């Protein structure tokens, strides 16, 4: 039986291409997150997430978590996801990344974090509201302990030029 207080840090390297990307491209297609839940078909809580990049390229995007391994298109191609494909992916949650605001530069790379989402409270008052991003519930399909993720580029910083293997997702889960 899985300890109800068990935690795990999962590292995943998504498949990306070594070409320049454009706005609304698929940064990476469905990527397996192994051991995302403690037992087959169960649920866990995603409590932290970051992307470590070996590149100093900045990018904005949307990171989706899904129950199934549904393709959403080829990496570095324009997003063109049908309603049926999106529904078949069984999306569990989404994180948005503002790469120029949510990054930390180290040596020759960057760390992009998803810890808090800051948004203006109103068009004229100038207040900023911090919206909590976690937890996100991750529900595995029957017969597996994996869930899946994909990322789409969207925003203002959307033309990164990276190398294969430049990105690593670091995900914290509680079972």
Each predicted region: which residue ranges?
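Surface-exposed, low-hydrophobicity beta-strand/loop segments enriched in small/polar/acidic residues
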Residues: 1-175
